[in-house]
């Protein structure tokens, strides 16, 4: 059965047809509407999926934010602007005329990455370190989403009670320190205004402050992984995202994790599917795996 998979991100919308063998075809992308209004998103989604819907039998959505009863929510409502409580599932069912499911994008990515692991892995955690920090948890072969869709939002666990205020309202969240946005916000002097990509370039050139910001991010993620190991006893952790997959970053995380006591050690690996993980994970869920 062919699935029309859609990935709704902060900067772009992606859609593709995916068959039961996870082959992707006719991938399309559009920028996410800057206005963040229901009408703008509705029209963008319509333009995105109209050329694809005739060949699909169902729709699967991976979206930023929290998906609760088919509606779009967020820990930081300001991120969604006028899209808070946007009826995501209902909107796509109307546009495509097909049965639709929706899941958080990091949860979807976790499900895709889980299916790429050896069969003896039943418990894994996926962590994406990018503009923000997100995640997904698979326990005994089942994806955890939670009644309210909150499961796996690991970026909003505590890193430093005296740290910066996070967009969710808490103080010292992992995301506020370790994410690309958090690193950029902490940059000072000649690095002020630099984005995470630039910080990694400067760190590679030996810039002391840039190296510290990257190292601090890796250490915070490593400590979070130790907490995750203690909470889930997962067999492995898969790391993705633009920061997580940046050159040398995973090695730093692994080195910091090895400084933790042995019971908190866990195998780390880089994400396999990268920017297709959300599309593939959502399609897998629609193709018979239930939430």
From Swiss-Prot:
Biological process according to GO: N-acetylneuraminate catabolic process
| Leading EC class | transferase
Any single Pfam family the record assigns to this protein: ROK
UniProt keyword annotations, A-Z:
ATP-binding, Carbohydrate metabolism, Kinase, Metal-binding, Nucleotide-binding, Transferase, Zinc
> Annotated pathway, please?
Amino-sugar metabolism; N-acetylneuraminate degradation; D-fructose 6-phosphate from N-acetylneuraminate: step 2/5
Provide the residue positions that the database annotates as binding Zn(2+).
156, 166, 168, 173
Which chemical reaction does it catalyze? an N-acyl-D-mannosamine + ATP = an N-acyl-D-mannosamine 6-phosphate + ADP + H(+)
Enzyme Commission number: 2.7.1.60
Q: Can you tell me which residues bind ATP?
A: 5-12, 132-139
**Per its UniProt record, what Gene3D superfamilies does this chain match?**
3.30.420.40
GO MF annotations in UniProt: ATP binding; N-acylmannosamine kinase activity; zinc ion binding
Function comment: Catalyzes the phosphorylation of N-acetylmannosamine (ManNAc) to ManNAc-6-P.
What subunit structure does UniProt give?
Homodimer.
PANTHER family, per database record? N-ACETYLMANNOSAMINE KINASE, ROK (REPRESSOR, ORF, KINASE) FAMILY
Query: What family name appears in the similarity comment?
Result: Belongs to the ROK (NagC/XylR) family. NanK subfamily.
- Cited HAMAP family: ManNAc_kinase
Q: What protein is this chain from?
A: N-acetylmannosamine kinase
Species assigned in the record:
Salmonella agona (strain SL483)
Q: What is the lineage of its organism?
A: Bacteria, Pseudomonadati, Pseudomonadota, Gammaproteobacteria, Enterobacterales
């Amino acid at each position: 059965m062919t699935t029309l998979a859609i990935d709704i991100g902060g900067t772009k919308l992606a859609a593709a047809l995916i068959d039961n063998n996870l082959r992707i075809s006719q991938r399309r992308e559009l920028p996410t509407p800057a206005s963040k209004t229901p009408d703008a998103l509705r029209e963008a989604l319509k333009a995105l999926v109209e050329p694809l819907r005739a060949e699909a039998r169902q729709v699967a959505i991976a979206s930023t934010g929290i998906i609760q009863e088919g509606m779009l929510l967020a820990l930081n409502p300001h991120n969604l602007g006028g899209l808070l409580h946007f009826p995501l599932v209902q909107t796509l069912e109307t546009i495509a005329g097909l049965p639709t499911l929706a899941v958080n994008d990091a949860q979807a990515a976790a499900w895709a990455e889980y299916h790429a692991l050896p069969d003896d892995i039943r418990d894994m955690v996926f962590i994406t370190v990018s503009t923000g920090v997100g995640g997904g948890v698979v326990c005994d072969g089942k994806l955890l989403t939670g009644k309210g869709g909150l499961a796996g939002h690991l970026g909003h666990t505590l890193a430093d009670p005296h740290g910066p205020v996070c967009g969710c309202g808490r103080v010292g969240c992992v995301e506020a320190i370790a994410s690309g946005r958090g690193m950029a916000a902490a940059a000072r002097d000649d690095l002020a205004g630099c984005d995470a990509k630039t910080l990694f370039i400067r760190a590679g050139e030996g810039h002391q402050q840039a190296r510290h910001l990257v190292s601090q991010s890796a250490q915070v993620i490593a400590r979070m992984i130790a907490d995750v190991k203690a909470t889930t006893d997962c067999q492995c952790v898969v790391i993705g995202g633009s920061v997580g997959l940046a050159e040398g970053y995973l090695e730093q995380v692994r080195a910091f994790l090895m400084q933790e006591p042995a019971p908190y050690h866990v195998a780390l690996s880089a994400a396999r599917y990268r920017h297709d993980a959300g599309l593939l994970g959502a399609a897998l869920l629609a193709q018979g795996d239930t939430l």
